[in-house]
Amino acid sequence: MSQVLEHLESAETDFLFFSQTICPYCTRAERTLDAHGLTYTEVNLDHHEGLREDVVTETRHRTVPVVFDLRGDEPVFVGGSDNLLEYL
């Protein structure tokens, strides 16, 4: 099982997003989710060796944040910060 799937399956929140330490768009995603009263799990790619490559392979999304909606039966790949704003 990929590291991405492990994180998606273990999260017990409304959303999960992959981030990096210095990332204004990740902060924007956090603030957006907070403003909508949604819970989220943040996974910092800087702290998980090889995870960034797995995220790119699974989503083809090369920038952070990489956001998933976990509220349904299956995780939904939302995209990045701009995509999240449109999605909500």
Where are these regions (language model features)?
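Local sequence-structure signature of Cys/Sec-based thiol-disulfide redox active-site neighborhoods
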Residues: 2-41
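Nucleotide phosphate-binding site architecture
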Residues: 24, 46, 85
